[in-house]
């Protein structure tokens, strides 16, 4: 006899992964509930991560643009804005996003429960709501999409008013003149750009020997040069020995013997999956040391009726990928298999000032693989559109196979890079000979546009062939 459950599926978390799963399930006729720990839906992406940090970055980059444009600024009266003022702008964007996403759930009749979820057994969840009451829900299947949080090493006192992580930095209400950013990954580099754009002194501590080592080396070098040129001090191959919170700031002692003092510290070195409160032991699951769960190609955990998507399964830890993972998991849960799958070449967008974006292979990877590739380049400063809008910093690089002309990788550094990359990505994904660099020479682009960089880069690369 088939058991009856309250729901066909319960989704834990309402970030991009949870939303993708919830919408995918409900569109296939499933009865679902969504459990969200916080007062507003949207998860870390909407409230502490992607959305507020990109809104911050946009505001800062517009200030920089104004101050550098001789039409508006004569350099005697620079436009200035405080971090706190700009945060008000981000709150407006966050509330629009929250309102819109709330509407998705309401229109699709998804029940939302607020509170902390924990497993009782493989089909039962207990929810502790904000007023302390306990509710039990049962479902045939579950999706764990509870995201991640900034990693807190035990020897750093995050209760100190001048020590922040990448979530709490959005509550910064004093005006720092000098900030130490520990961790030069994507988040560290993005905030280094934001603070430097607000004329704050920045010490960026990198635990590795170069910035964002997963990028094509030229892109990484471009960012390093741009930081250096703007006065960001980068300290490579450093680790902290001790972090000392003092009355007027923070002192960081490095293992190399150096000492740094600043008005505040942003610790941005790693993230931890939010699995510790789920009582996973009750369903025979175990997270690794960073709170992450292992899944198969259909996002199924070792417990067959429990799936996991988003940051909680680790790489690639992107909001864009999490949404797709949720959608794919929903299909697998209803149909037993998923015809869709995550694309092999997921584009990377890094919202530094200027942006970096890439898709496909790097020069270093292709060289190691002994692939006979050629390079086509376009400098933004040679494009009419870039000259008109004053976006002269940057370049587009296309890597393609010398013989087949197949595009193997695209790398872009400069304003709007994360948008520009998708034109090349669309051609790269074409099958049956559609992926060729010659497309960019044989098509007609609007003029003047930034997209025209593809035509310039394609001609540059094809002219190298002999």
Swiss-Prot record:
Keywords, ordered alphabetically: Cytoplasm, FAD, Flavoprotein, NAD, NADP, Oxidoreductase
Cofactor remark: Binds 1 FAD per subunit.
Chain's gene name: sthA
BP GO annotations: 2-oxoglutarate metabolic process; NADP metabolic process
Catalysed reactions, as listed in the record: NAD(+) + NADPH = NADH + NADP(+)
Main function: Conversion of NADPH, generated by peripheral catabolic pathways, to NADH, which can enter the respiratory chain for energy generation.
Positions with a binding annotation for FAD: 36-45
Gene3D superfamilies the UniProt entry points to: 3.30.390.30, FAD/NAD(P)-binding domain
Protein family: Belongs to the class-I pyridine nucleotide-disulfide oxidoreductase family.
Assigned EC number: 1.6.1.1
Cellular compartment(s): Cytoplasm
Pfam families: Pyr_redox_2, Pyr_redox_dim
Protein name from the UniProt record: Soluble pyridine nucleotide transhydrogenase
Keyword NAD annotated: yes
Top-level division of the source organism's lineage: Bacteria
Named cofactor requirement(s): FAD
GO cellular component, one term: cytosol
Main location: cytoplasm
Group of enzyme by EC: oxidoreductase
Molecular-function GO terms, alphabetical: dihydrolipoyl dehydrogenase (NADH) activity; flavin adenine dinucleotide binding; NAD(P)+ transhydrogenase (Si-specific) activity
